[in-house]
């Protein structure tokens, strides 16, 4: 999309003294459809509306020094009073604010219904995503249970569902696998030690001095990463550095999730085929995994393959029906739970594990394991991994909470959301859990089934508690291929983003490129590197946009004080001898040369004019030998007898957000070059920040502050008045464009 179609309107305050009511209530412009510039010129004898200078008095800045500022801040934040203590407690525990006001009659039915449905959906997904995180199934149930309870206490969003999220599970799984390899564990060390660990004992590996087996060490790594990620999130909330999420644009997050979805799909392929393959990590793991899959395709377990196909044939159409008829269905069909129950019964009574060597979930213990402190020795190894995990987690949580709050007309506190998601990771990390965040799919289900408040999270937790205390062992015979299918089917939303690309391309090609770069790097390199590449590329695109910004000459809309781009609109009026130039970007060291070249190209190049004058003077010298004083006299005569048509350049600064020292120096240089050939430079519509920069940078002297105007129209009127006062003859028809 060209910037001309989005040019800003520069509307100056009309002269109230004139009482002019002749302006039309609406301004109609016709977009320029042709390559040639079509505009009208004022006649030379036209009179500009009477010129009156706009004067605005600036607010006086307080002279508070740094010491006084610090003292005031400390007094404000460090005072202890009953009222302040109460506000702090209520702010940290939002449940104490809204729960006493809970409307039981109005909200209870919707909250219970949505909580039940989300809980039913979470049971199979929690078990399935545990495999993605490299953990035993019970740990996924723990994670969803504790996250639901803690967010109920600390969260400010009424609608988001906090629990396991596929992309974070993938990132946890990659870290866990790497640490398992570093510790010397391999696929052979997968003894079912959950029952032993749950009884408080440890298992000694016969080949080493390890204090626990592979699954025990895996959750140790996962809980340590989760603890550090939670600490990062709480620290970001405490220091109010949520601005980090600003660098994660919607295009970047969408591309990252889509790229990670390919990695998730790839990691689940071995379960669908029943292959016993090592999990690959690092750069290019997606390609390496598929190479391993095709090399071992002849070892496919037909029982697992048939089960996977049958589950896909049931899950995909039903999920599509749920989505297509969600407005007519009171609640989505819990097809995942139906498939899990049916597959578990078929596997148990058909003895698929014993007869066909089908891989199953295995023993899932009931109850809760004793809390355990994260492994401090692992912190140096996983601290860097936790940075990306924490940023993705809070960015998705905050963006979803703000989106649904806006939709339903209430507000959320971004910092409190960071506290909430941080403690949803810190506290559960002591109870054998891994990282959580909000998830869009479950949040949409929660909203569509009548959720009103955070109380629905308690109902979800009760459903999970029932499974943990009673039902969990019944999933012993559940095939892992079924869990893999559930994981893959839930990737539909992320993979459908490809359908949005044509629309995204028509809106912003730059965002589309960011999406592709982030998606490809996340899929082909790794999730962490993909996120880093996406952030760096987004920042590069921002710099690129300001390095080569759009600029244009402006014309006056007839019978108004509105100025628009002559290259975008037709029938705009151009005042002879005055060029109005708009630069759509901050003016700083990166784009200063672009500013000068665009200005010189679209108006007149003062350097070329001075060179032409010098050449003309030299020709005069060759024709007639004169003294040095004579040369100066001849040049002065030459200049006075060949006046330029262009006498004023007005720079519209409305789109210039800020200036740096290089930008101020560039404006000084431009002004000096133009004044050398008799053209005055005026600045219009400078915001207060730009005005302060110009004043501090000594762009003009105190008596020259009249060269800064509050509107483009005011600057144009001033230029005409000053030209008429000087009595300069302005010839018509002379073009000075340097094109």
From Swiss-Prot:
Subcellular location: Cell membrane; Apical cell membrane
Residue ranges annotated for the STAS domain, each copy included: 568-719
A GO cellular component annotation in the UniProt record: microvillus membrane
Biological process (GO), any one: chondrocyte proliferation
Activity regulation (record text): An extracellular acidic pH inhibits chloride-sulfate and chloride-oxalate exchange activity whereas an intracellular acidic pH activates chloride-sulfate exchange with no effect on chloride-oxalate exchange activity.
Positions of glycan attachment: 199, 205, 357
Signal peptide as annotated in the record: none
Transport among keywords: yes
Modification Phosphoserine, positions: 12, 16
Catalytic activity: oxalate(in) + sulfate(out) = oxalate(out) + sulfate(in); sulfate(out) + 2 chloride(in) = sulfate(in) + 2 chloride(out); oxalate(out) + 2 chloride(in) = oxalate(in) + 2 chloride(out); bromide(in) + chloride(out) = bromide(out) + chloride(in)
Effect on the protein upon substituting residue 678 to V: In ACG1B; reduced sulfate transport; loss of cell membrane localization
Region annotation Disordered: where it falls in the sequence: 1-27
Gene3D superfamilies to which the protein is assigned, alphabetical: STAS domain
Topological category with respect to the lipid bilayer: Multi-pass membrane protein
Phenotype upon changing residue 653 to S: In EDM4; no effect on sulfate transport and cell membrane localization
Keywords on record: Cell membrane, Disease variant, Dwarfism, Glycoprotein, Membrane, Phosphoprotein, Transmembrane, Transmembrane helix, Transport
Disease implicated: Diastrophic dysplasia: An autosomal recessive disease characterized by osteochondrodysplasia with clinical features including dwarfism, spinal deformation, and specific joint abnormalities.
NCBIfam families assigned: sulP
Protein name: Sulfate transporter
Record organism: Homo sapiens
């Amino acid at each position: 999309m060209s910037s001309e179609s989005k040019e800003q309107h520069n509307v100056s305050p009309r002269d109230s003294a004139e009482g002019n009511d002749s302006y039309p209530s609406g301004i109609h412009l016709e977009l320029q459809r042709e390559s040639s510039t079509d505009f009208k010129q004022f006649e030379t004898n036209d009179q500009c509306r009477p010129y009156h200078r706009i004067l605005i008095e600036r607010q006086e800045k307080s002279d508070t020094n740094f010491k006084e500022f610090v003292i005031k801040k400390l007094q404000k934040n460090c005072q202890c009073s009953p009222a302040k203590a109460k506000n702090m407690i209520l702010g940290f525990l939002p449940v104490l604010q809204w729960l006493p006001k809970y409307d039981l009659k109005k909200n209870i039915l919707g909250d219970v219904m949505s909580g039940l449905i989300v809980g039913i959906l979470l049971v199979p997904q929690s078990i399935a995503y545990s495999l993605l995180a490299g953990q035993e199934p019970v740990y996924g149930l723990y994670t969803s249970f504790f996250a639901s309870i803690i967010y109920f206490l600390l969260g400010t969003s009424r609608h988001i569902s906090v629990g396991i999220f596929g992309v974070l599970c993938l990132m946890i799984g990659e870290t866990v696998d790497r640490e398992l390899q570093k510790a010397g564990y391999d696929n052979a060390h997968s003894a079912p030690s959950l029952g032993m660990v749950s009884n408080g004992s440890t298992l000694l590996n016969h080949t080493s001095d390890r204090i626990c087996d592979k699954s025990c060490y895996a959750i140790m790594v996962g809980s340590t990463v989760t603890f550090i990620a939670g600490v990062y999130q709480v620290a970001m909330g405490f220091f109010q550095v949520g601005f980090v999420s600003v660098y994660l644009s919607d295009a970047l997050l969408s591309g990252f999730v889509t790229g990670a979805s390919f990695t998730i799909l790839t990691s689940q392929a071995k379960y669908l085929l029943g292959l016993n393959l090592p999990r690959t990590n690092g750069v290019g793991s997606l390609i390496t995994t598929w190479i391993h899959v095709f090399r071992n395709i002849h070892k496919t377990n037909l029982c697992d393959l048939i089960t996977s196909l049958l589950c896909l044939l049931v899950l995909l159409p039903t999920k599509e029906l749920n989505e297509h008829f969600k407005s007519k269905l009171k609640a989505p069909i819990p097809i995942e739970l139906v498939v899990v129950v049916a597959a578990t019964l078929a596997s148990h009574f058909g003895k698929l594990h014993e007869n066909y060597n089908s891989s199953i979930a295995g023993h899932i213990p009931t109850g809760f394991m004793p809390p355990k402190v994260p492994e401090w020795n692992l912190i140096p190894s996983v601290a860097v991994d936790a940075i990306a995990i924490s940023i993705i987690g809070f960015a998705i949580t905050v963006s979803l909470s703000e989106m649904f709050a806006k939709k339903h007309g209430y507000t959320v506190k971004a910092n409190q959301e960071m506290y909430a998601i941080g403690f949803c990771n810190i506290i559960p990390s002591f109870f054998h859990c891994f990282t959580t965040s909000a998830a869009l799919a479950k949040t949409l289900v929660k909203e569509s089934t009548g959720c009103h408040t955070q109380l629905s999270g308690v109902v979800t937790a009760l459903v999970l508690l029932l499974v943990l205390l009673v039902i969990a062992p019944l999933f012993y015979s559940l095939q892992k291929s079924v869990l893999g299918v559930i994981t893959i089917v839930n990737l539909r939303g992320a993979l459908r983003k490809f359908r949005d690309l044509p629309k995204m391309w028509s809106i912003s090609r730059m965002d589309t490129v960011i999406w592709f770069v982030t998606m490809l790097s996340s899929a082909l390199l790794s999730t962490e590197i993909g996120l880093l590449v996406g952030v760096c590329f987004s920042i590069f695109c921002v710099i690129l946009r300001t390095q080569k910004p759009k600029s244009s000459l402006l014309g006056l809309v007839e019978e108004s004080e509105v100025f628009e781009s002559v290259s975008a609109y037709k029938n705009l009026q151009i005042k002879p001898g005055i060029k109005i130039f708009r630069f759509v970007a901050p003016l700083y060291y990166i784009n200063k040369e672009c500013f000068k070249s665009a200005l010189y190209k679209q108006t007149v190049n003062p350097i070329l004019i001075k060179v032409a004058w010098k050449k003309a003077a030299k020709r005069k010298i060759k024709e007639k030998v004169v003294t040095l004083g004579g040369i100066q006299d001849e040049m002065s005569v030459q200049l006075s007898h060949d006046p330029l048509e262009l006498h004023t350049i007005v720079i519209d600064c409305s789109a210039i957000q800020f200036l740096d020292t290089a930008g101020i120096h560039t404006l000084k240089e431009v002004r000096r070059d133009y004044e050398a050939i008799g053209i005055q430079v005026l600045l219009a519509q400078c915001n207060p920040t730009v005005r302060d920069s110009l004043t501090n940078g000594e762009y003009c002297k105190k008596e020259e502050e009249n060269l800064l105007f509050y509107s483009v129209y005011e600057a144009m009127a001033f230029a005409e008045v000053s030209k008429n006062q000087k009595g300069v003859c302005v010839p018509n028809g002379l073009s000075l464009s340097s094109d």
